[in-house]
A protein has these predicted regions:
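A contiguous binding-surface segment within folded domains or other stable secondary-structure elements
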Residues: 40, 44-100
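HotDog/MaoC-like acyl-thioester-processing domains
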Residues: 4-16, 72-76, 84-118
């Protein structure tokens, strides 16, 4: 029997995660800790991968993480994860993180990376 695999477009599994930077998430300089941001990015990427594959997925590798700017207590962080390539048993996911200042509404890119999930 010939069974066709269901095709999913990247937009169907794109994931948006939102967090608020709290004092416990910051370093002694009052900036969001890089490790906390990478944790949030990993959760968004895992949800994206599992939504796309309809299976439990784990992070296989994280390529270069670029920390472009910082975020402070009270900033709203939005993390966008999207599938960029799919292979037989793995997929590549692009993750970008943005910060938004509550009072001014200014939104800016704070980090990005590419990662593989299996």
């Amino acid at each position: 029997m010939n069974v066709l695999k269901k095709y999913k477009s990247p937009s169907e599994s794109a994931t948006l995660k939102t967090e608020v930077v709290c004092p416990n998430d910051t370093n002694p300089m009052g900036r969001l800790q890089g490790g906390k941001l990478v944790e949030w990015m990993d959760i968004a990427a895992a949800v994206c991968a599992q939504t796309h594959s309809e299976k439990i997925c784990v992070t296989a590798s994280i390529n270069q993480v670029d920390f472009i700017d910082s975020a402070c207590v009270g900033d709203i962080i939005t993390i966008h994860a999207v599938i960029t390539r799919v292979f037989n048993s793995s997929m590549e996911i692009s993750v970008e993180s943005f910060a938004r200042k509550v009072l001014s509404g200014k939104k800016y890119l704070i980090s990005r990376d590419r990662r593989a999930h299996v």
